């Protein structure tokens, strides 16, 4: 039985939304990867996924690496999405042979995450104007990202009832809907409390209509702050502080690296970051070792 690519992809995406409960961002990434796969199938004249061979799939990976100009990590993610599609088709009884079983993903060269110095982190935070509504908000966001190790998506979706400033902790909803309660630093707690008292009520008052947002961080119109806007806040603070190449994830990297430099156990840091594998967290230990080598060489 023929398995048309378009119908198969549609069915698979509906499956991951309904059955797996994946986040909107994750599903959107799957869709982009599989759109790329469908475009290649159109180019080579293949529509029946049941007839796709491992050799043809290897051609797709080569095309993605060479002609589509994707990085090794993007190719790996795309292959993972295609592999998920074929596993779904096999589970549904639509194919008898999975062409992805004998296909390996390209290896990714180890790229160490960038960590800011404490001095640069402070400079970014202090670049926010403490006398304006947005400056107070921006400082709270920066302090929270660095003081909790939260992902940017976790920060902008955080609700007021998830915060416990008395115990200085927050309940974060991470990838796959997994929840974890993590402590937040005293500076972050104070900055968020100042924002909740001095800035958020005034921003909320600017809301014209619609639902009252439960999210902690708001935009100038009183609505929930978007990921893109939060990214812009971090980038603007870095520019004001003269710190190049900074993203929200850089603050998360810095949180982890500084904890490990202070002697924290790698598995504790793994729990705080909400990472499923300690191997991912151990990358940060390489950063701290490299830094120790630099200090030793300079002494």
Predicted feature residues:
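Conserved catalytic core of the tyrosine transesterase superfamily
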Residues: 1-299
